[in-house]
Amino acid sequence: GGMGTSGLLNAWCPFTDGEKIIYKGIAERVFSESKKGVPHIHYDNWVPINGEYLKVVYDDLVTSEGVSVLFFTTMAAVEMKRKGVVDAIVVANKAGLSTYKAKVYIDCTGDGDLAAWAGADFVIGDESGSVQEGTLCFTLSNVDPYEFSLIGNVHTNRKDGPIHSIYGNPKYPLVKDKHMNDKLIGPGILGFNAGHVTVDSTDPVSYTHLPSPR
């Protein structure tokens, strides 16, 4: 849920094979419910994500099943009973450090932190350790709907799109490729997914001090 909400990702990757939805279960339920937050969209691939609406969808899914939620709480450590068996997890929030025990632990960290810290085997990146580059997601509000309707979009596919004059311009040395797509999230709100940055999301030093562009 983090990428579609706090991560500001602007669209779902395709859920269909071109004819029908192929992801079922919880995935389809989340997708179908989240589409209600973008009622202006009438297609099923690359559907915009209304992050604020998606938060409610996720909250409703877990609370309707009786789950007690703690916002702004992060897993801090794993305590092992023995090799391969988790005894407890330690979480951190404004109340400090707290320990929780359960019969079953489900890793929802996104990066597999619980499994990795518990000693599970894992692989990061390619043979050299390089990982897929991240993109920069952001939103713009108070966009004039009339002016935007005249433009349509600023996607890279448009030969007259602004990214083509930005890329290679010495004024913007951090822009190292032409990746740019935008989605109309709601009235006067555009969501963007643009550019790439060389960063390892599992390394705090990496995403705090981004390397210089190639």
Label each residue range with its predicted role:
Residues 208-213:
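Conserved small/polar residues in nucleotide/adenosyl-binding loops
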